[in-house]
Amino acid sequence: MAFWNNRIVLTADFYTSRTSDMLYVYDVSVPPFPYAKLLANLGKMRNHGFEFGFGITPIRQKDMELNINMNWTFERNKLVTLNGDYNGQYLTAPDLKGISYLYGAGYHGASDVCFQMVGQPLGVFYLPHFLGFRENANGGKEYMVSEEKYICGQATPKAMMGSNIAFRYRQWDVTVQMNGAFGHKVYNGTSLAYMNMLSLPNYNVMQGAPEMNIQDQDISDYWLESGDYVNIDYITVGWNIPIKSRYVKNLRVSCSVNNVATITSYSGLTPIINSTVMDSTLGVDDKRTIPVYRSYSVGMNIQF
């Protein structure tokens, strides 16, 4: 829909899908199968979501123009089943299986934190609940956790946002690009490892670790944090230089800053980690994901 001579544009889309015949590796008996592993199309998943777009041009004049565009996506998915019939044989898969885990220097022994669970979204955190600290024989702190695990969040965002703001004044223009993700969690494995005083002397510890004096690395929801963020992807400032030349038609110079800032409550390295790919790093911040770096660039465009 468009209003005000196309200066306000609204778009909305709803989608729902049911995916069947998903590939999965099954453990099977030999015989009747020639191998102990079988790749079969039996899994089912359901997805539905809503996409909303908004664009407005509040200023449109000869020497000045401002355009603001934003889109939001809200998505839900559910793993319905992995079981099914294959050539007369009913194949089953575990209802609960680990997807991602903590790994790397400073953490001794990998352990699953994010799981594939039938009846839930792909990539849920299934962890013991943190009950408090207790003092050990050395005067350090240990985690007290519940015996039972519970679903305490998901690694995939429930909502995603993208925005572009473009402003022009005579020969000058400024463009700002932003994106965000909301409704998901990040497991701060970096803090779990480096807030642990038992990491010394083999590894360094983080600032504040001696004061807290944690001497434990048991996994619980203590280091599970909100992954919500808004990231300013880049800001570009350009100048179309007025030029009178029989050889040069247009001359433009610009400068850009990429990864300007991230607005988030997350206390770890960065919330911008793997939140979509179903592999061992899903939803986990444990140094395997290289943080997005800031860069600066200068450009020149000449048209002859």
Feature annotation, model-predicted:
Residues 40-43, 50, 57-155, 258-268:
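Conserved small-residue
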Residues 8-10, 66-68, 72, 163, ...:
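Transmembrane beta-strands of outer-membrane beta-barrel proteins
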Residues 179-260, 265, 272-274, 282:
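Extracytoplasmic gating/loop element in the C-terminal half of outer-membrane beta-barrel translocons
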Residues 51-53, 292-304:
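Outer-membrane beta-barrel "beta-signal"
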Residues 26-35, 83-93, 191-201, 266-279:
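Flexible, surface-exposed loop regions and adjacent strand-edge segments
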Residues 1-33, 73:
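Membrane-embedded beta-barrel scaffold of Gram-negative outer-membrane proteins
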Residues 14-20, 56-58, 72-78, 169-171, ...:
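Transmembrane beta-strands of outer-membrane beta-barrel pores
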Residues 1-4, 9, 98-175, 213-227, ...:
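Outer-membrane beta-barrel transmembrane strand signature
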